[in-house]
Regions:
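Short S/T/G/P-rich N-terminal loop/turn motif that feeds into the first structured element of a domain
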Residues: 1-57, 61-71, 87-220
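Short, well-ordered, aromatic-rich surface patches in folded extracellular/luminal domains
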Residues: 75-78, 87
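Regulatory input/activation interfaces that engage signals or partners
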Residues: 83
Length: 220
């Protein structure tokens, strides 16, 4: 059965109270306590200079599990109040990066890191036909950096799908691919750098990078 790997990435309203931000953080970190369909839920605060502040990463066993999550009462009663444009309790903002919901399909939890590890998330728009070329670059980057303990490159299928996570409604999206990198520490993730960009050249048309420590609601 094909799993769905998913990210929600937000900029926070500077006027939002710390109490509300903390409440959203806790509700997303501990999502699997309230919505059984949610797997491997973790949150993080972005430490890069990209003005995106909050990342919620998680997964679903199947598209059907994801669809049940979307109509769960906890989603409507708790998450939507923090996120929806028409909610008076909204604490996130629109951002100039055209980033919000991203993700991909996989056959197993190939993305999984232990709690307390760090993620470096590279969002890319690759030129047409360059995915295999760039995949070789990711493999080379991992071979050169022993601190890069996990590397996954995948097409951002969530960016072009409807709310069911399956039905394609757009031909393209701003970031065509996601490169997940895993490190044992935030310091290692921050120090990893982007030397790979020189090799990628024109194959990469657009890119932003985020890194954060995993505050995980799951056990290793």
């Amino acid at each position: 059965m094909t799993m769905l790997r998913r990210f929600e990435i937000y900029s926070l309203d500077p006027k939002a109270s710390q109490a509300k931000v903390a409440a959203m953080h806790a509700s997303m970190r501990n999502a699997q306590r309230y919505i059984p369909e949610v797997l491997h839920s973790a949150v993080g605060r972005n430490e890069s200079d990209v003005a995106l502040h909050f990342v919620w990463e998680h997964a679903y066993e199947s598209a059907q599990s994801y669809q049940r999550y979307k109509v769960h009462a906890f989603h409507a009663n708790i998450y939507d109040r923090y996120l929806l444009n028409d909610s008076p309790e909204r604490i996130v903002t629109d951002n100039p990066y055209d980033v919000g919901l991203l993700g991909y399909s996989c056959e197993a939890p190939i993305y999984l890191l232990p709690p307390g590890a760090a993620r470096r998330l590279v969002l890319l728009r690759l030129a047409e036909g360059q995915a295999d070329f760039f995949r070789a670059i990711t493999a080379e980057a991992q071979s050169r950096n022993p601190q890069l303990i996990l590397s996954v490159l995948a097409e951002n299928t969530f960016g072009t799908r409807w709310l069911d996570g399956v039905t394609q409604i757009l031909e393209t999206t701003t970031y065509s691919h996601i490169w997940e990198q895993g490190y044992e520490s935030l310091a290692a993730a921050a120090a990893a750098g982007s030397d790979w960009r020189a090799s990628a050249g024109a194959a990469v048309e657009k890119v932003i990078e985020l890194w954060y420590e995993l505050d995980a609601g799951y056990e290793e």
